[in-house]
């Protein structure tokens, strides 16, 4: 049963605050996640038990925040530093050693001090030998009374210095110093590593290329080893968004790391000198949080998903939440959080809070719901704050939010606005008068971009009926870069206008044109528009051009709900339409801004007959059409269910 909650204005007026500055913002990141209670509990449980998680949902719904909050609930295990040591037996297979957090730096420092001491001792020895040679030369020159011996002694000392100073064995004092791959302090929290979009080397580790590979100039293999994100996330959380975009080889490597809890580091490029280097297995005991949109499952490695499912949880996050008292308070908390995080914008007063909540209602696209696409809603909060700052005010008001909505229109909306102006100038659609076979349909752009906001546009549809080239070989020809679903919608609608008109269309070619759809058409929300245009063309009944319409259509003529209905109604208003026909089931989903209210008559339709009554201009032909429709309905056969017949089995009597 739906809760009858009061209007947003009344609800906000009862809040015991002046601005969002009076709202308490939780310190714990987990408590800042809005509207994901069920997903939050699962993630918390997964963290406590060190389970892996797949989070699936729309962008901006809090998946990364949920993943990041897991580090606060991970069991307090001892973090470890990871060191890589040279391997005297096989230089291309460096050794790996783990020590408690904070000890790695001490060990490296001890080796560095030892190397520096050995270097100083060796330098003293070299200088002693050089001075000895020079001194012997001077003594010999004095004894033999030959100044040339001093010159030869100096030359010998110089050659000796160069030979000893540039000797690879002597020069590589630091070759035995280990490299610290992963470092922590004893007070660090478990690491959270975001590896979204990382290439193979950054994700799995890599061995840098060595341009000097011989002659004593090469860099020791262990010094060229670089830890990957899977190793940096050891004892912590590894987060990968858009998991399906990872290469299959990388997904397979992550699967191996999950199974073994360790993974060796090797060169990722076959052309690199590091390609021949492979370390001992490096610890990588992490909790994997994989996230993605709804299409992520299709391209995810089956074995990796099976591993996560077998040792963890799969969670679908919410796109919207119920519009009730508790969730409205969460939205107010969200506004306060965004202001605190940004640190550059002022707080919001009550009037601004009202506008943000109304926008959340509108973007949900459903009645009695609030959107959870909060990243984009946060963008509106920041733009409104920027406007207030530019006007040198220390409070954000409703006027700032309204101005922000106009200023921060998505690209699709800006393009659509320009497109509508061009279409008006060149009259590709009309807003008055009547035309046979021409309908003002409505569509949305941006539905496939992943954005929360839909942008509505007027989609003129024209139908024309011509005799078929060959008898009995009539075709339905639809043009306008139609997608698969749109093509199927045209075929489905053909059943409706065959039934409504009652005419044999096998001798007709029905041409349907989607005007100006250079970017293509996809979806079935133009079904009622197609049916109306074709019926108008077949029956020669004009269509009222001040009417716009949207809705899907079943083969039986029922008008079905569609998406983005608010954006479509707004497009009809901006185009100057007087009426708009929408599916009856979508009627309560329409949420208009104050600037759009009472500017258009919204007519709900349950069947195609409801659409035709409004869209077709009154005429004798229209009366005949509806008389025909009435006779079809009256003559429809009603099939009564038959009583079930009792069945008998051999050897049984049924009473």
UniProtKB/Swiss-Prot annotation:
Leading EC class: hydrolase
Biological processes per GO annotation: protein catabolic process; proteolysis; regulation of DNA-templated transcription
Cytoplasmic side: 1-123, 167-655
PANTHER family per UniProt: ATP DEPENDENT LON PROTEASE FAMILY MEMBER
Extracellular compartment segments: 145
GO cellular component terms attached to this protein's record: plasma membrane
Topological category with respect to the lipid bilayer: Multi-pass membrane protein
Record's protein name: Archaeal Lon protease
Cellular localization per UniProt: Cell membrane
Residues annotated as catalytic: 525, 568
SUPFAM superfamilies the UniProt entry points to: P-loop containing nucleoside triphosphate hydrolases (SSF52540), Ribosomal protein S5 domain 2-like (SSF54211)
Role summary: ATP-dependent serine protease that mediates the selective degradation of mutant and abnormal proteins as well as certain short-lived regulatory proteins. Degrades polypeptides processively.
EC number: 3.4.21.-
Membrane-spanning segments: 124-144, 146-166
Keyword Repeat attached: no
Pfam families assigned to the protein according to its UniProt record, in alphabetical order: Lon_C (PF05362), LonB_AAA-LID (PF20436), Mg_chelatase (PF01078), Sigma54_activat (PF00158)
Quaternary structure note: Homohexamer. Organized in a ring with a central cavity.
Entry binding sites for ATP: 57-64
Residue runs in coiled coils: none
Membership in a protein family: Belongs to the peptidase S16 family. Archaeal LonB subfamily.
InterPro entries: AAA+_ATPase (IPR003593), Lon_arc (IPR004663), Lon_proteolytic (IPR008269), Lon_Prtase (IPR027065), LonB_AAA-LID (IPR046843), Mg_chelatse_chII-like_cat_dom (IPR000523), P-loop_NTPase (IPR027417), Ribosomal_Su5_D2-typ_SF (IPR020568)
Domain Lon proteolytic: 433-618
Species of origin: Thermoplasma volcanium (strain ATCC 51530 / DSM 4299 / JCM 9571 / NBRC 15438 / GSS1)
């Amino acid at each position: 049963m739906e809760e009858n909650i009061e209007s947003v204005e009344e609800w906000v007026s009862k809040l015991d605050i002046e601005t969002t500055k009076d709202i308490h913002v939780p310190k714990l990141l987990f408590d800042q996640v809005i509207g994901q209670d069920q997903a939050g509990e699962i993630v918390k449980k997964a963290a406590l038990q060190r389970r892996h998680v797949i989070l699936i949902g729309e962008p901006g719904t809090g998946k990364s925040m949920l993943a990041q909050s897991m580090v606060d609930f991970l069991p307090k295990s001892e973090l470890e530093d990871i060191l890589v040591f040279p391997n005297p037996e096989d230089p291309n297979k460096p050794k790996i050693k783990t020590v408690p957090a904070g000890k790695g730096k001490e060990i490296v420092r001890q080796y560095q001090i030892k190397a520096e001491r050995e270097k100083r001792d060796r330098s003293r020895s070299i200088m002693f030998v050089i001075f000895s040679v020079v001194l012997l030369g001077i003594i010999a020159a004095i004894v033999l009374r030959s100044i040339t011996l001093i010159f030869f002694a100096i030359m010998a000392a110089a050659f000796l210095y160069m030979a000893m100073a540039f000797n690879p064995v002597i020069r590589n004092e630091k070759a035995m110093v280990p490299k610290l791959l992963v470092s922590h302090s004893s007070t660090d929290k478990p690491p959270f590593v975001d590896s979204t979009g990382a290439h193979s080397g950054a994700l799995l580790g890599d061995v840098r290329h060595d341009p000097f590979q011989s002659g004593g100039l090469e860099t020791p293999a262990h010094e060229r080893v670089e830890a990957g994100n899977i190793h940096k996330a050891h004892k912590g959380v590894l987060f990968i968004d858009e998991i399906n975009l990872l290469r299959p080889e990388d997904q397979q490597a992550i699967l191996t790391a999950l199974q073994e809890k360790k993974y060796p580091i090797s060169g990722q490029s076959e052309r690199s000198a590091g390609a021949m280097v492979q370390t001992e297995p490096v610890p990588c005991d992490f909790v994997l949080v994989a996230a993605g949109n709804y299409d992520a499952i299709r391209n995810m490695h089956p074995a990796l998903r099976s591993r996560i499912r077998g040792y963890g949880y799969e969670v679908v996050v919410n796109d919207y939440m119920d519009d009730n008292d508790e969730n409205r308070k969460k939205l107010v908390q969200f506004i306060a959080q965004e202001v605190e995080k940004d640190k550059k914008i002022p707080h919001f007063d009550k009037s601004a809070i009202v506008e943000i909540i109304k926008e959340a209602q509108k973007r949900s696209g459903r009645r009695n719901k609030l959107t959870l696409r909060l990243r984009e809603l946060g963008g509106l909060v920041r733009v409104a704050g920027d406007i207030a700052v530019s006007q040198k005010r220390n409070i954000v008001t409703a006027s700032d939010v309204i101005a922000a909505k106009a200023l921060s229109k998505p690209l699709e909306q800006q393009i659509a606005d320009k497109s509508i102006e061009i279409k008006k100038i060149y009259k590709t659609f009309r807003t008055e008068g009547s035309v046979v076979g021409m309908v003002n349909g409505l569509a949305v752009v941006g539905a496939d971009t992943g954005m929360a906001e839909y942008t509505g546009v007027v989609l003129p549809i024209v139908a024309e009926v011509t005799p078929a080239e060959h008898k009995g070989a009539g075709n339905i020809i639809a043009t306008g870069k139609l997608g698969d679903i749109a093509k199927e919608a045209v075929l489905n609608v053909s059943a409706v206008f065959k039934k409504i008109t009652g005419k044999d269309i096998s001798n007709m070619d029905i041409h349907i044109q989607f005007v100006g759809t250079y970017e293509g058409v996809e979806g079935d929300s133009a079904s009622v528009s197609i049916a109306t245009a074709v019926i108008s063309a077949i029956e020669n009944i004009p269509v009222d051009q001040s009417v716009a319409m949207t809705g899907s259509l079943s083969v039986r003529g029922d008008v079905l709900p569609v998406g983005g209905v608010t954006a479509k109604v707004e497009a009809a208003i901006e185009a100057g339409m007087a009426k708009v026909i929408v599916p009856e089931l979508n009627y309560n989903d329409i949420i208009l801004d104050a600037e759009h209210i009472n500017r258009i008559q919204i007519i709900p339709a349950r069947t195609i007959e409801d659409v035709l009554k409004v869209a077709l201009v009154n005429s004798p032909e229209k009366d005949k059409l509806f008389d025909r429709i009435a006779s079809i309905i009256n003559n429809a056969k009603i099939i009564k269910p038959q009583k079930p017949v009792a069945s008998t089995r051999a050897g049984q009597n049924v009473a």
